[in-house]
């Protein structure tokens, strides 16, 4: 019975991937919502959907395509689906969406319940893992290197507002280097680059660049020491996120 249930989830994911790879329209989106266990609105209603991000200035500069709109809609809809707690459905589902929506999405991408705007401005390398509750403001562009780990409730921002004129915005990209780790509750501010293999401690507010292999903590974040690598680097650091490398087998 258990194996049959797993096969049923796999079969749904196969159909979802085929529909996504074909290019989403209201009909395909309606079908996928049903496969997610959601009582989907009719296709005419789906055709009129507008996302929050489409009311942002950056979206006015480069409007969403219909496909991008439906991909983002499906990503956000998953958290309201009966199958959302089923990790063996939710992880592959998000990967399917990210590989089509993101500017780039490498192999073995893993994400729990996270939110972002303008997913088309996110680039993720291989073996990226993002924990639940994280929010990515991608208006200015976000690049996540290979084997980056991001903890729960991390916030990444790429824009600010003028204090004297709220409508005046400044954008600056965030880059997190290969094998860096950002622990729970940290905040990364616009324009920051976090170096390879660096660690951002939980709750830190990062306002300036972090050197490679540095450990930073505090508000604002300051270098407190070097990462204890014991001579290891990159793959030797064994950024295997779940037991027995689950979902890192592409």
Please annotate each region the language model reported.
Residues 1-100, 229-250:
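Terminal amphipathic alpha-helical/low-complexity segments used for targeting or macromolecular assembly
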Residues 104-105, 109-224:
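Structural signal for interior beta-strand "rungs" in well-ordered beta-sheet cores
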């Amino acid at each position: 019975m258990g194996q049959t249930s797993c096969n049923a989830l796999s079969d749904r994911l196969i159909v979802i991937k085929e529909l996504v790879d074909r290019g989403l329209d209201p009909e395909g989106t309606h079908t996928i919502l049903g496969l997610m266990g959601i009582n989907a609105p009719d296709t005419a209603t789906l055709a009129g959907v507008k996302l929050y991000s489409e009311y942002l200035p950056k979206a006015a500069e480069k409007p969403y395509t219909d496909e991008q709109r439906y991909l983002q809609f499906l990503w956000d809809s998953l958290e309201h689906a009966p199958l959302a707690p089923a990790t063996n459905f939710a992880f592959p589902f998000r990967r399917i969406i990210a590989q089509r929506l993101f500017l780039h999405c490498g192999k073995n991408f893993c994400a729990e319940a996270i939110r972002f705007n303008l997913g088309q401005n996110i680039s993720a390398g291989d073996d990226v893992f993002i924990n639940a509750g994280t929010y990515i403001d991608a208006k200015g562009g976000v690049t996540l290197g290979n084997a980056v780990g991001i903890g729960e409730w991390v916030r990444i921002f790429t824009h600010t507002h003028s204090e004297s004129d709220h409508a005046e915005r400044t954008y600056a990209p965030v880059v997190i280097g290969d094998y860096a780790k950002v622990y729970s509750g940290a905040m990364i501010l616009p324009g920051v680059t976090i170096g390879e293999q660096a660690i951002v401690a939980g709750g830190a507010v990062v306002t300036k660049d972090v050197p490679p292999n540095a450990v930073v903590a505090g508000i604002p974040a300051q270098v407190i020491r070097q990462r204890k690598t014991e001579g290891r680097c990159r793959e030797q650091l064994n950024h295997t996120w779940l037991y027995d490398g689950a979902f890192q087998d592409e």
